[in-house]
Amino acid sequence: MSLPSSCKSTATNQHSTTPSLTEGEIVAGITYYHNRSLTAEQYCTLLEETSLGERRPLAERERIAAMLEHADVLISAWQGERLVGVARSVTDFFYCCYLADLAVSERVQACGIGRELIRQTFHCLQPGCKVILLAAPQAVDYYPKIGFTRHNSAWLMEDVSALR
């Protein structure tokens, strides 16, 4: 089994920007890219325009840069030269994909960009691969509307010192 070429990354974590069937697709004036490089500054600017910015280490630019560099799937949405949305995922591509961040600028929310970012993420996965996410409190009602089902057994440990 192989992955779509636009979704593969090399051993050095330099992501491919080879077009897929939907690469550069313009939907309602928004252009979507698979694994296009983003700077920590671009990403943080977007997150500051969303509720997700409250829960990410925006002051730690090196950490943000590493989060972007090590993402397996990074889908970005652009309105001209302006970054308006990102879906950042960690995955094995075959069984499960953890959608770590789904961010859409509040200026363009309710336009279908989040749904399209998720659809583009699925284009990078093998059939049958599940997408898993933890919803922000403000987004709990959004995900069922677009097809996600609630799962009641998620667990979180923020530091190894909590391990007993």
Where are these regions (language model features)?
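Conserved beta-strand in the GNAT
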Residues: S76, R82-T91, C96-A103
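Conserved active-site alpha-helix within GNAT-family acetyltransferase domains
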Residues: P127-L133, P137-L163
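Conserved acetyl-CoA pyrophosphate-binding loop and the N-cap/start of the following alpha-helix
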Residues: V108-L117
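Short amphipathic alpha-helix that is part of the acyltransferase structural core
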Residues: P4, T17-R61, A154, R164
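A short helix-loop-beta-strand connector motif used in the catalytic cores of GNAT acetyltransferases and
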Residues: A65-S76, C129-K130, S153
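Intrinsic-disorder-associated, low-complexity terminal segments enriched in Asp/Asn/His/Tyr and depleted
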Residues: N13-H15
